[in-house]
Every structure is written in C-alpha cells, then in structure tokens.
C-alpha cells in the first residue's frame, strides 16, 4: 500500500511539472493567459487528476473565464502531457481554481495594514514602553517620599 501511495505522489509531482511547462510554453490560447499550477492530486487508480491552478487576476468573472478556457482545452492539454510522460493510462485532467494564494495575499495585506496603523498610533501617542516607564518613575518618586517620613 505504501508503495502505491509513493507512486501516485511521484506521478502527481511529475504531472505538475509537465503541466506547468505545457501551459507556459506550448499553449497559445490567449484566453488562458498566465497560469500557475499549484498542486496536482491523482486518484489511486490514476484515472483522474485534479489540477489546482491560480491566475494573477482578482476579478471573479475573469478567473471563471480563464478556468472555463482551461477546462475546454483539457483534452488537448492531456494529449500534450501524455506525449511527455511514459504512462500506460494518462489521467483525465480536472482543473480547479485554488484561491489559497489570493487569500494568503489578502491576509498578508491585512497584517501589513494593522502594523502600519500600530506604527501611526505609536508615533502619535508614544510607545507603550515609554508610557510604562513614565508610570514606574512616578511610583518610584512617591515611594521615596513615604520612606522619608
């Protein structure tokens, strides 16, 4: 069983590399544009391959158009990749949009915005360390006067 999993993983990795090369070099369809193959998940019997792709577009309508173009070109892409790989049966390609990259960029932008807001507040009101040090200095002065009485 472990050997079978290892083989499917190796095939998935090779398929990902070959798909990336085919989509970058051999595909001349302007509807697809620049596409990144993030991952490939191959079924255990090697009959299907789910291909996770991303586009550098944020508009959902444009992304859907590009995904539809990939889906319609899947049989042609499959024949191009089959010529490069030595498999008895080439898996049927199913393209799926992977939004994890877009979500990661969105989260990174949110974190950057919060950091910038914190820096602006720190410059406006002073840092929390300065406020704490001033408070400690004030308590030390009052403690000294109590000890002298």
UniProtKB/Swiss-Prot annotation:
- Where in or outside the cell? Cytoplasm
Q: Which stretches are tagged as biased composition: Acidic residues?
A: 131-143
Q: Which GO terms describe its cellular component?
A: cytosol
User: What InterPro entries is this protein classified in?
Assistant: KH_dom-like_a/b (IPR015946), RbfA (IPR000238), RbfA_dom_sf (IPR023799), Ribosome-bd_factorA_CS (IPR020053)
Q: Which GO terms describe its molecular function?
A: ribosomal small subunit binding
Question: SUPFAM superfamilies, from UniProt?
Answer: Ribosome-binding factor A, RbfA (SSF89919)
Q: Supply the Pfam families for this chain.
A: RBFA
Q: What is this protein called?
A: Ribosome-binding factor A
Is Cytoplasm one of the keywords UniProt gives this record? yes
* Biological source species: Shewanella sp. (strain W3-18-1)
Q: Which residues form the signal peptide?
A: none
Write out the function statement from the record: One of several proteins that assist in the late maturation steps of the functional core of the 30S ribosomal subunit. Associates with free 30S ribosomal subunits (but not with 30S subunits that are part of 70S ribosomes or polysomes). Required for efficient processing of 16S rRNA. May interact with the 5'-terminal helix region of 16S rRNA.
């Amino acid at each position: 069983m472990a050997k079978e999993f290892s083989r499917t993983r190796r095939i998935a990795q090779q398929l990902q590399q070959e798909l990336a090369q085919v989509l970058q070099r051999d595909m001349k369809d302007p509807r697809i544009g620049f596409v990144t193959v993030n991952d490939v998940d191959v079924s255990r019997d090697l009959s299907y391959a789910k291909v996770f792709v991303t586009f550098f577009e944020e508009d959902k309508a444009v992304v859907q158009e590009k995904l539809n173009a990939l889906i319609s070109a899947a049989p042609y892409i499959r024949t191009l990749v089959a010529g490069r790989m030595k498999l008895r049966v080439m898996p049927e390609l199913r393209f799926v949009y992977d939004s994890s990259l877009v979500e990661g960029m969105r989260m990174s932008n949110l974190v950057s915005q919060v950091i910038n807001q914190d820096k602006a507040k720190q410059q406006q009101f002073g840092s929390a360390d300065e406020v704490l040090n001033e408070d400690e200095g004030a308590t030390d002065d009052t403690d000294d006067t109590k000890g002298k009485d």
